[in-house]
Each structure stands twice: as C-alpha cells, then as structure tokens.
C-alpha cells in the first residue's frame, strides 16, 4: 500500500475521491444558494450587522472553495489533521454554516413575531 494519499488514489482510485469531491462541491453550492436567499429576502431591512455577516460568510465561502480546490493537490500525512490551517479551515466552514443557519432562524422568528402582532 503506498504511503501517500495521491499514490493510493492513483493505484486504486475507487469512488471515494469522486464522492468526497462532489460532496464538498454540493456543500459549496448549497452554501452559495443560502447566501443568495439571505440577500434576496433581507436586503430591504438589512442593517450594518447583516452586511457584515454576509461579508464574513462570503470570505468563508472563498476559504471553502480554496479548501476543496486544494484537497486534490495535497498528500495527507498523520500530522495534517492537527495542523493549524487545516483545523482553522474546517472550523471556519462549520462556523459559516452555523451562522447562516442562525441568520435564517432569526429572520423567520422575526417574521413570526410580526405575523402574530398583526393577528392579535
């Protein structure tokens, strides 16, 4: 069994590299679609905090794109999972997804409050 990930992929590619690549690409597309929806539905009532969060989310989307692009270029060693930049990228991806979910939750809760006030 070859030691490097790239050599193993060349020796027996299987479907795992393709599935992983497609999963990251699907994550990036879904993330982009959610960002577009956030801008579409909230631009009219957006304050400075909204635009700052959209800017941060766009930066993290670029990091996600960079991370998925570099997955095919790197060889994985045992220390790669403890290196700072790898852990940072994964943390920022998770943080971006969480913050986008919170943004949508707050927006929907606000809409529910407005609806309940109109009904009452």
Swiss-Prot record:
The keyword Cell membrane applies. The keyword Transmembrane helix applies. Its main location: membrane. It is a multi-pass membrane protein. Residues 40-48, 114-120 are periplasmic. It is found in: Cell inner membrane. The chain crosses the membrane at residues 22-39, 49-68, 91-113. Residues 1-21, 69-90 are cytoplasmic. Keywords: Cell inner membrane, Cell membrane, Membrane, Transmembrane, Transmembrane helix. It holds the Pfam family DUF202. One of its GO terms (cellular component) is plasma membrane. This is Inner membrane protein YidG. The gene is yidG.
């Amino acid at each position: 069994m070859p030691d490097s990930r790239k050599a193993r992929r060349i020796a027996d590619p299987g479907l795992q590299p393709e599935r992983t690549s497609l999963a990251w690409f699907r994550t990036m597309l879904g993330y982009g679609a959610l960002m577009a929806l956030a801008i579409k539905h909230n631009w009219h009532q957006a304050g400075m905090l909204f635009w700052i969060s959209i800017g941060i989310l766009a930066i993290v989307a670029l990091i996600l794109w960079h991370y998925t692009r570099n997955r095919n270029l790197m060889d994985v060693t045992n220390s790669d999972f403890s290196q700072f930049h790898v852990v940072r990228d994964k943390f920022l991806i998770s943080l971006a997804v969480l913050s986008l979910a919170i943004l949508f939750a707050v927006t929907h809760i606000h809409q529910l409050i407005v609806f309940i006030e109109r009904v009452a």
